[in-house]
Curated annotation (Swiss-Prot):
PROSITE patterns cross-referenced by the UniProt entry: RIBOSOMAL_L16_2 (PS00701)
Keywords associated with the record: Ribonucleoprotein, Ribosomal protein, RNA-binding, rRNA-binding, tRNA-binding
Protein name as it appears in the record: Large ribosomal subunit protein uL16
Family from the record: Belongs to the universal ribosomal protein uL16 family.
Biological-process GO terms, alphabetical: translation
Subunit (UniProt): Part of the 50S ribosomal subunit.
Name of the gene: rplP
CC terms in the record's Gene Ontology section: cytosolic large ribosomal subunit
Pfam families attached to this UniProt entry: Ribosomal_L16 (PF00252)
Gene Ontology molecular function: rRNA binding; structural constituent of ribosome; tRNA binding
């Protein structure tokens, strides 16, 4: 499970997830990747589930990179608790994803195998994504 070792503050404000990604939008490490088409947030369990799905399919032949890291704490108050008494405890760690962000990268396998593997990972994520290559990464999403 991905989570920060330590943080300056335990809890964070909710914020808004608007606009398009400006960083992490190009394939930097691999030949193929998975790019977000819509906004959302992804937690460490979803990242791990997607990673396992594509790793099993390529049978560890490919070199892969995870380009996102959940560094935002999400809090939740216990069930049947009255309002007030402060903010709840940290429930999970997430990362806000904006359209255009590269989630996973892969190299060392054929395009066909990479497409199949990353399609399995797409189904594990809570927002729409698309398969990109070095040639197709600059297309409008």
């Amino acid at each position: 499970m991905l989570l920060p070792k330590r943080t300056k503050y335990r809890k964070m404000m909710k914020g808004r997830n608007r606009g398009y990604a400006t960083r992490g939008v190009d394939l930097a490490l691999g030949e193929f990747g998975l790019k977000a088409v819509e906004a959302g947030r992804v937690n460490s369990r979803q990242i791990e589930s997607a990673r396992q799905a594509y790793t099993r399919h390529v049978k560890r032949q490919a070199k892969t990179w995870i380009r996102v890291f959940p560094d935002k704490p999400i809090t939740k108050k216990p069930l049947e608790t009255r309002m007030g008494k402060g903010k709840g405890g940290v429930e999970e760690w997430v990362m806000n994803i904006k359209p255009g962000r590269i989630i996973f990268e892969m190299s060392g396998v054929s395009e066909e195998l990479a497409r199949e593997a990353l399609t399995l990972a797409m189904h594990k994520l809570p927002f729409k994504t698309k398969f990109v290559t070095k040639e197709s990464e600059n297309e409008v999403y």
